[in-house]
Regions:
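Alpha-helical transmembrane segments of multi-pass membrane proteins
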Residues: 1-318, 323-606
């Protein structure tokens, strides 16, 4: 019998890759918090496989070792392919979680979906337990090969998803597992098996990209919204320019051809689409996992000429920082389609440095990419440098006290959330430590411009960000942090200006006047609160600031209906603003990517 160490290594290698690729599939199909079900259901599969062996141990150990392993690998090969194909086509929707206790069909759908996830891990759990039971004296060696296989599998994920994407990678794993099963029947030693596997890997690697098409059509949860462009708009109204998997998910580029649809998207998306061109030119759209999207305007000379688009300075609410700053040095975190770079350049920015974490966006916007010319070469324009790195990392590498404006315009970490690296609601861009890092980077008169979603009833993430900034300013040495902050409500967005030094009276007045003429309501500080800090008001931003001054901010946060606690890098749950006492399993809230529906995911994990 060939060495069992090879098999342990191989199935651990396959196991970690299955978990990672299934993570990618589920996040592409549904919301990011669905992803975190994979690990517990994989563990459930291990447990079922292990218990199956223990229950039928006597009968199984009467069989030939070679036969048990070969048949198990054959079954694993088939199940990998079947589970993958069914998981891609199977409808998995957030409404199943919402109706978990109210609808039997929802329970049935979830059970079916997670059974598909679990099945391959039943075989893996069976095989691992089989080898450890068969050779208990070699458990240390078996464990070593198990860890090495898992470690190399995790590293191989990045190579495979960039090379073969998702379905073809899983097809390769299924093929290699089938090959190993056959080799167990025909080979006499593990050296022959290794050579055979390597030969099959090379052959499959050469032929798969040509012979096996990558599946593009998935059953997507409609709750993802209009960013699922193929599901929301007729095919004749858009062109698919690009579609590619990478470690953060799948990025698609759509050119929106229908002017009415372009206008409808523009009107509904407010802040993220605002550009100081009149009229706005045609745009395409980057969608990563049909969530983390960004527009790319056709700012090539012919694109601007087609609609006679002209720069119109100070026509948009998001240009408010430039009422104070003149020819600033700018950092853009989340450069996306280059809109913030473009607006900074129109205001004479002395230099612009940007970070774009998504490798597909960075590649397509850079020289040689499909949208480099279309975007007006914005990523390679004069005095512009864009890096394919995380925003926090970029800030750490720049010279302190050397920039005047840091822009985070609706930057969300859906891509990071969806990898499974984060837990439900993390973001390291909005922690207290992050704000302190941003402040260190600024010149004395510099400012941070956060643009976040604005909730009409009880503010959530904007109020949470308000609390974070007040605390960060205090720890950075500000004597009166509330004098460093101005917040405006712009349509469904908040414009947050955080200045390193206090706003002067003239600067405040300039911002207030700009707000009045650009559909923006002054949220903080209101005149009533500024004139008499003891005045009670229904404005929660004023109330929190007053509690902060009085040293009672923790009391305010405790009684506030949503979680607005200050987060740090050690506790970075920015998107967690629902408290457990709000959770009613029979009336689950879904608010875009958040809501008490997250508690339903956690219940399934438990």
């Amino acid at each position: 019998m060939p060495s069992c160490h090879l098999v342990i290594f191989f199935i651990s290698f396959v196991c970690i890759l299955l978990e990672l690729f299934f993570t990618r599939i589920l996040n592409f199909k549904a919301w990011n918090h669905i992803v975190y079900i994979i690990i517990p259901f994989a563990i459930l599969g291990y447990g079922i496989g292990a218990n199956f062996l223990l229950i039928f141990k006597e009968k199984i150990f009467r069989l030939k070792e070679r036969m048990v392993v070969a048949v198990s690998l054959l079954a694993l090969s088939a199940i990998i392919l079947i589970s993958t194909l069914l998981l891609i086509r199977f409808p998995l929707r957030v409404e199943y979680l919402v109706n978990l206790f109210a609808n039997l069909s929802a329970i049935s759908r979830l059970l079916q979906a997670y059974t598909l996830v679990m099945l391959p891990f039943v075989i893996i759990g069976f095989l691992v337990t089989y080898f450890f039971s068969l050779k208990p004296s070699e458990s240390n060696k078996l464990y070593f090969f198990d860890l090495v296989g898992a470690g190399l599998g995790a590293a191989a994920f990045f190579f495979l998803i960039n090379w073969l994407e998702v379905f073809r990678s899983l097809f390769l794993l299924s093929s290699l597992t089938l090959a190993l099963s056959i080799l167990f029947f025909i080979c006499k030693n593990h050296r022959q098996i290794i050579l055979g596997l390597l030969a099959i890997f090379v052959v499959c690697g050469a032929l798969l990209p040509r012979l096996v098409p990558e599946i593009k059509e998935y059953a997507i949860d409609p709750a993802k919204g209009w960013e699922w462009i193929p599901g929301y708009y007729p095919k004749e109204d858009y062109d698919t320019l690009f579609s590619e998997w990478h470690p953060l998910g799948r990025t698609d580029i759509y050119r929106i051809k229908n002017p009415q649809i372009r206008q409808a998207i523009f009107d509904s998306s407010a802040g993220t689409f605002e550009i100081n061109l009149d009229p706005p030119p045609e745009f395409s759209y980057f969608a990563t996992n049909f969530l983390a999207g960004t527009p790319i305007y056709n700012m090539a000379p012919d694109g601007l000429q087609k609609y006679n688009s002209q720069v119109k300075l100070f026509s948009q609410g998001m240009e408010v920082p430039y009422t104070i700053l003149r020819e600033p040095k700018v950092v853009v975190i989340g450069t996306g389609g280059g809109r913030d770079i473009f607006m900074a350049k129109t205001h004479g920015a002395a230099g612009i440095v940007g970070a774009e974490i998504n490798p597909a966006i960075f590649e397509q916007m850079s020289k040689g990419g499909r949208l480099h010319e279309y975007s007006g070469q914005i990523y390679t324009a004069d005095n512009v440098k864009v890096f394919n790195i995380d925003g926090r990392h970029l800030v750490k590498t720049l010279q302190p006290n050397s920039y005047d404006l840091i822009i985070l315009n609706g930057v969300d970490t859906f891509s990071g959330l969806s990898t499974g690296a984060y837990a439900y609601a993390e973001s390291y861009l909005y922690t207290k430590n992050a704000v302190i890092d941003y402040l260190k980077l600024l010149s004395d008169d510099g400012m941070i411009n956060f643009n976040r979603w604005l909730f009409a009833d009880y503010p959530r993430e904007t109020l949470k960000l308000h609390a974070i900034c007040l605390q960060a300013l205090r720890e950075a040495g500000a004597q009166e942090p509330w004098k460093h902050i101005i917040i405006g409500g712009h349509k469904r967005w908040s414009i947050n200006l955080i200045k390193k030094t206090p706003f002067t009276a003239e600067e405040k007045q300039a911002v207030k006047e700009y707000f009045k003429t650009h559909e923006t309501e002054l949220i903080f500080p209101t005149e009533n609160w500024e004139n008499n800090a003891a005045v009670e008001t229904t404005n929660y931003y004023d109330q929190y600031a007053q509690a902060f001054i009085d040293g009672k901010e923790n009391v305010f946060a405790h009684f506030y209906p949503f979680d607005i606690s200050v987060i740090t890098d050690d506790d970075p749950f920015f998107y967690k603003y629902y408290k457990l006492n709000f959770f009613n399993p029979f009336a689950v809230a879904v608010v875009h990517h958040t809501g008490t529906v997250i508690f339903m995911s956690q219940m399934l994990v438990l």
